[in-house]
Design a protein with these regions (language model features):
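Membrane-embedded beta-strand positions of outer-membrane beta-barrel proteins
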Residues: 78, 177-181
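Outer-membrane beta-barrel proteins
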Residues: 48-52, 124, 168, 172-177, ...
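Outer-membrane beta-barrel "beta-signal"
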Residues: 183-194
Length: 194
């Protein structure tokens, strides 16, 4: 039985994925990093409505909203397709297509965190290299998800890729998707209406 268990974990992913000691204390408490991402999201939405989409910064904020929504939705679709077991659901990174409530791949929270910062890095990175420090947010969220034994390392890597690609796709649009969907007046920020 032991040889069967070891053989089952000898898939390609198992060379990257490994169980990390559980830690949900202090900064690794999920409510801490979820609160940080939620706070930044609220600030981004408020800033986007205030600024509008006619300025460089305003347009980037609207692209960030698009990117977060696309990243979250894409990750959710991936979870439903791959139904990978989480580390705390058997400690085997090779358990794919398990059905039921196994939604480990890709990490939705890592996707959203990467999607939140990607448009800003793409827009401002060449002008202001310090913008790349925003990568600390998805790095922090991803590390938290692994330390909470909620995701394997490759779940987080895939989540970062989904978020980054969502940011890239959102940044390529001349008019952000949310601006296309909302009434035309939203393009002009609240600050210009006063």
């Amino acid at each position: 039985m032991l040889s069967l268990h070891c053989e089952a974990q000898n898939c390609g992913w198992s060379r990257v994925d490994h169980l990390v000691s559980y830690d949900a204390s202090g900064i690794w408490n999920p409510s801490v990093y979820r609160g940080l991402v939620a706070g930044l999201t609220v600030a981004q939405v408020g800033g986007a409505f205030w600024e509008g989409s006619e300025t460089r910064f305003g347009k980037t904020m609207w692209q960030g909203i698009d990117s977060e929504l696309i990243a979250g939705a894409s990750a959710e679709v991936g979870k439903r397709i791959f139904t990978r077991a989480r580390p705390n659901e058997g400690n085997n990174p090779c358990l794919w297509f398990q059905g039921g409530s196994h939604y480990s791949f890709p990490s939705g929270e890592a996707s959203v965190a990467a999607g939140l910062v990607a448009p800003y890095m793409i827009e401002y990175g060449s002008d202001h290299p310090a913008t790349y420090a925003l990568l600390l947010l998805p790095l922090y969220v991803g590390a938290g998800r692994v330390k909470n034994q909620a995701h394997w390392q490759t779940d987080v890597l895939a989540g970062w890729a989904v978020g980054g690609l969502s940011g890239w796709a959102s940044h390529r649009l001349d008019t952000p998707l949310m601006i296309q969907l909302l009434p035309h007046g939203v393009a002009v920020g609240i600050k210009k209406q006063f």
